[in-house]
C-alpha cells in the first residue's frame, strides 16, 4: 500500500511538473534569472530567438481567429447575428464600466500619492537576425473576415463553405497543439529575460509600484464583479469557470497578448462543465479581440497618474468621461499586440488629454510594466462573458449546436 501511495504521488508530481502552468512559471523564473546575470553578448543571441518565436506565434493568431470564429458562426445558424450583437454589447459595456470604475478610483486615490522621476532603462541589443514573418492579414482583418464569411455562409446556406471552415478549424487546432503550445514556455522565458535585462523589473517597477498594485487590485475587483454578475444572470456556478482559468492567466502574463493566449484560453474554457461548447468556440475567440477590460482599466488609471505627475493636475471629469467612452472603442484596434491598447489610443491621449511627447513616453513605459497583468485580466474576464452568453442562449431557448473539438 505504501509503495502504491509513493508511486501515486510520483505520478501526481510528474503530471504537475509537466503541466503547462508549471512550465510557464518555470519559464518566468528562468527568464528573470537569465536577464539579471547574462552579459550583452548572450542577450545578442537571445533577443533574435525571442523575436523569431514572437513572429511564429503572431503569424498563427489570425489563423486561430478565422479557424474558430467563422465555423462557430456557421454552427449558430440563424442565431448568429443575434449572438454577435449580444457579445459586442456585453464586451463594450464591461470595458467602459471598468474604465469608469478606474476613473473614480483615480480621483479618490491619486491626489494622495507621490511619485519620483523615472529611471532610464538599459538598452537591449539590436536584433541582428531581423527575420520577419508577416501575418497573412492583420488580426482585425481576420476578425472582420471571420464574421462576414460566417454570416454570409449562414445566409446563403453554403454547405461546402461550412464544411471547409470546419476542416480549417481542425487544421488550426493541430497547429496550436503541435507548434504554439510547445514554444510558449520558451517564448515567455525569453520575454522575461529581456524585461529583467533592460531594467523594467528592477528599476521601473519600484517607481510606480504603488500604482501597479492598485491597478492589479482593480483587476481582481472587476473580475469579481464580472463573474458574480455572470453567475447570477446564468444561474450557474461562476467558480466552475474561474477555477480552470489559471493556465490562461499565467500564459497571458507571459505573452502580454490576449490573441496570443487564445489557444490556452480555449483549452481552459472547454474544461468548464457549465459553459456550452458552442458558446465557448464562438465567444472566447471573439472576446479575445474585443474585450479589453483590464487594459482599459489600467490605461485610465495611469493616464490620470501621468497627468498629475507631469502636468500637476488631474484631467477634468468631463474630459475623462469622453476619454473612457472612446477608449473602449479605440482599444479594439489593439488585439494581439503587447502594449497595443496604449498604441491604438495614442490619438486619444494626445488629442483629448493633451499629453506631449514626455507624457506619451512615460505612459508607454509604465503601462509596459503591468501590461501582462492587464492582459491576464482581459483573458480571464472572457470566461465570465462567455458564461453570460451561455445564460442568454439558454434563457432564450437558443438550441445547442453539436460541436465536438478535442482541446
Model-derived features with residue positions:
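Transmembrane helix boundary and interhelical junction motifs in multipass membrane proteins
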Residues: 64, 183, 257-265, 296-301, ...
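Short amphipathic alpha-helical coupling elements at transmembrane boundaries
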Residues: 47-58, 163-178, 243-251, 267, ...
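Juxtamembrane helix-boundary/capping and inter-helix hinge elements in multi-pass membrane proteins
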Residues: 39, 74-82, 154-159, 167, ...
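Transmembrane alpha-helical segments and their short flanking loops
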Residues: 114, 301-407
Amino acid at each position: 500500500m505504501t509503495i502504491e501511495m509513493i508511486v501515486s504521488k510520483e505520478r501526481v508530481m510528474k503530471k504537475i511538473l509537466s503541466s503547462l502552468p508549471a512550465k510557464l512559471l518555470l519559464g518566468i523564473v528562468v527568464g528573470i534569472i537569465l536577464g539579471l546575470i547574462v552579459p550583452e553578448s548572450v542577450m545578442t543571441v537571445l533577443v533574435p530567438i525571442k523575436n523569431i518565436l514572437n513572429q511564429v506565434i503572431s503569424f498563427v493568431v489570425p489563423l486561430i481567429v478565422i479557424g474558430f470564429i467563422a465555423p462557430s458562426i456557421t454552427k449558430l445558424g440563424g442565431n448568429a447575428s443575434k449572438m454577435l450583437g449580444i457579445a459586442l454589447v456585453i464586451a463594450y459595456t464591461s470595458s467602459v464600466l471598468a474604465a469608469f470604475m478606474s476613473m473614480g478610483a483615480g480621483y479618490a486615490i491619486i491626489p494622495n500619492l507621490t511619485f519620483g522621476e523615472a529611471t532610464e532603462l538599459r538598452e537591449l541589443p539590436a536584433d541582428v537576425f531581423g527575420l520577419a514573418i508577416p501575418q497573412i492579414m492583420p488580426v482585425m482583418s481576420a476578425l472582420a473576415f471571420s464574421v462576414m464569411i460566417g454570416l454570409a455562409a449562414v445566409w446563403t446556406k453554403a454547405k461546402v463553405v461550412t464544411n471547409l471552415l470546419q476542416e480549417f478549424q481542425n487544421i488550426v487546432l493541430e497547429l496550436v497543439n503541435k507548434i504554439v503550445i510547445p514554444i510558449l514556455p520558451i517564448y515567455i522565458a525569453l520575454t522575461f529575460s529581456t524585461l529583467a535585462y533592460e531594467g523594467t523589473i528592477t528599476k521601473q517597477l519600484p517607481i510606480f509600484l504603488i500604482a501597479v498594485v492598485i491597478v492589479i487590485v482593480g483587476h481582481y475587483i472587476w473580475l469579481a464583479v464580472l463573474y458574480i454578475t455572470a453567475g447570477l444572470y446564468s444561474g450557474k456556478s461562476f467558480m466552475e469557470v474561474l477555477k480552470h482559468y489559471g493556465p490562461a492567466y499565467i500564459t497571458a502574463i507571459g505573452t502580454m497578448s490576449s490573441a496570443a493566449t487564445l489557444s490556452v484560453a480555449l483549452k481552459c474554457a472547454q474544461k468548464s462543465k457549465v459553459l456550452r461548447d458552442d458558446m465557448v468556440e464562438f465567444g472566447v475567440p471573439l472576446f479575445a479581440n474585443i474585450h479589453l477590460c483590464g487594459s482599459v482599466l489600467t490605461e485610465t488609471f495611469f493616464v490620470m497618474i501621468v497627468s498629475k505627475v507631469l502636468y500637476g493636475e488631474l484631467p477634468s471629469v468631463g474630459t475623462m468621461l469622453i476619454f473612457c467612452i472612446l477608449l473602449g472603442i479605440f482599444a479594439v484596434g489593439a488585439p494581439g499586440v503587447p502594449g497595443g491598447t496604449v498604441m491604438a489610443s495614442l490619438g486619444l491621449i494626445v488629442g483629448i488629454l493633451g499629453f506631449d511627447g514626455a507624457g506619451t513616453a512615460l505612459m508607454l513605459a509604465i503601462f509596459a510594466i503591468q501590461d501582462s497583468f492587464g492582459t491576464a485580466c482581459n483573458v480571464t474576464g472572457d470566461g465570465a462573458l462567455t458564461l453570460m452568453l451561455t445564460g442568454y442562449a439558454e434563457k432564450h431557448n437558443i438550441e445547442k449546436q453539436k460541436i465536438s473539438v478535442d482541446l
